[in-house]
Design a protein with these regions (language model features):
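Secretory targeting and sorting signals
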Residues: 1-33
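Short, solvent-exposed, charged loop/turn and helix-capping segments
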Residues: 119, 123-170
Length: 214
């Protein structure tokens, strides 16, 4: 009886961890049709940057580092914003739905040997994984050279910072998105990849709330 209770508690905990990631992702769109969230993943188009009239913002204290922002910084963030506006929300919807689907093929919870979570052979789970990881690969490949092109400076205390507004957010979003992809591809448990998903959501939320891409 005690072992059954322990398994039940463990299952509830795992479901809660994954669903908590989902709630962060879809919070702003809570009034949307729930069936929209459950849509199967589809391949996302390759982003081709186009000319735009976007310019960076310099709220305090970034007005103090404006002189350190280069043309390369501006071009990199302009193009990353085009990706963010076009695909970030949909990509995170796909990731969160996949995380949810990974723990539910055999009912709520993850049981050792149940064929869920780390086993992608249930139903069309492998197909979902292939589509989502390909989309993440594509996004990471797009972000990598641009995030790496951002200027990083050091202040008087030896701390590294990005002179351009939200440069750090884009850089860390790229890093953690790469970690999410590696975790899914290596069949890591949903609870193990969950922290990286939450970090992507954190930095994506910061970018969104800053209005830097408007």
């Amino acid at each position: 009886m005690q072992s059954r209770l322990s398994r039940a508690v463990g299952s509830f905990t795992c479901v809660f961890i994954v669903l908590s990631g989902v709630s962060v992702a879809v919070g702003p769109a809570s009034r949307a049709d729930p069936s929209d969230y459950a849509r199967p993943p589809v391949p996302l188009p390759v982003i081709t940057p186009t000319p735009s009239d976007w310019v960076p913002k310099f709220p305090f204290p970034f007005d103090q580092t404006k002189n350190r922002v280069t043309d390369a910084d501006i071009n990199a963030e302009r193009e990353m914003c085009q990706w963010f506006n076009a695909q970030y929300d949909e990509l995170m919807r796909q990731i969160n739905r996949l995380q949810f689907n990974r723990i539910t093929p055999n009912g709520p919870g993850v049981y050792m040997g149940s064929g869920s979570d780390w086993d992608y052979s249930i139903g069309d789970l492998q197909q979902q994984v292939d589509i989502v990881t390909t989309n993440i690969d594509q996004s990471v490949s797009f972000l990598a050279p641009r995030a790496q092109a951002l200027t990083r400076s050091t202040d008087h205390a030896g701390n590294v910072y990005f002179p351009i507004y939200q440069g750090e957010s884009f850089y860390l979003l790229w890093q953690h998105l790469s970690n999410v992809n590696a975790g899914i591809k290596s069949h890591q448990a949903a609870w193990f990849t969950g922290p990286s998903v939450h970090r992507v959501l954190r930095w994506g939320s910061r970018i969104h709330r800053s209005n830097v891409c408007e």
